[in-house]
Amino acid sequence: MASERSPRDLYQLSIGYILILITVWTPNPYQRFFFWLSFAVVVGFCLQGRLRGEPLGLGFQGFLRSTWVIAIALMLSLLAIYFAIREHTVHYFFGHTIFGPRAWGYLVWATLQQFILQTFILTRLLRLFPERSTAILLAAFMFSLAHFPNMLLVATTLVWGIGSCALFLRYRNLYTVGIIHFVLGVTLAVSIPSDIHHNMRVGLGYYFYRPHHSVTLYRGINPKPISHR
C-alpha cells in the first residue's frame, strides 16, 4: 500500500512545496495570486487524503493531554519578555498592541503553517521514508528552508519544526502546535529588535524591509533607542 502511494505523495509534495517557494519569492501583487493558488492546491491534496481516511489533525483529540506543553511555552515566553524588558528591546507587535487584530491574525497564520507542515508535508514524508526520524528531519528542513534568507527564522524554525512534528505525532492535534507557534512567534517578534528579524519577513519580502522606530510596551522603563543606521 505504501509503495502505491509513494509516487502520488512525491508529486503532490513537490508541486505543493514548489508553489510555496514561488509564493515566498514573488513580489506583490502577483504574490497574492500564488498564495491563494498554493493554499488551494495544498488544501485540495489534503482533502483528497481525507477521503482516503487520512486524519487532518483538526479534531480536539489529544488537545487536553497536550496543554502542559502550551503552559511551558507560555512560561518560556514570559521569561524571554522579562529579559527583553531588562534589555529595553521589547516593543509592540509590528507597531500594534499585542491584542490587536494583526496579532490575533497571526494565530490563524501560525496554525495554517502547522497545517502545511504536519498535515501536508510530514504525512507524506512518513509514507515516503520508512524511518520516522528521517521524515521529521526532512519536514523540519523544508519548513526551515521556506524562511530563507531570514537566518534567525531559518534556525528557529528548524528547531521548532523538529519539535512540532514530534508533538504532532504524539498528540495528533494541530491546535496545540498552532498555539505554541503563535506564542513563540509573537515572543520572538516583540523581544528582538525588528532590525534583526525584519518584521519576521521571509523570501523576497526580507529585502524590502524598511526600518521604523519601534514603540516600547513599557514607557516607564526608559528604553534605549534602537538604532536604524
Report each predicted region and the residues it spans.
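Interfacial transmembrane-helix boundary/kink motif in multi-pass membrane proteins
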Residues: 1-15, 50-79, 94-102, 128
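Alpha-helical transmembrane segments in multi-pass membrane proteins
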Residues: 2-50, 69
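Hydrophobic alpha-helical transmembrane segments
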Residues: 10-14, 67-71, 100-103, 133-138, ...
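Aromatic-anchored segments of alpha-helical transmembrane domains
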Residues: 16-25, 75-84, 140-149, 183-193
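Structural signal for the C-terminal ends of transmembrane alpha-helices
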Residues: 25-26, 44-54, 82-86, 167-170
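Membrane-embedded alpha-helical segments of multi-pass membrane proteins
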Residues: 33-42, 99-104, 108, 112, ...
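Function-critical hydrophobic alpha-helical transmembrane segments in multi-pass membrane proteins
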Residues: 92-145
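Functionally important transmembrane alpha-helices
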Residues: 154-214
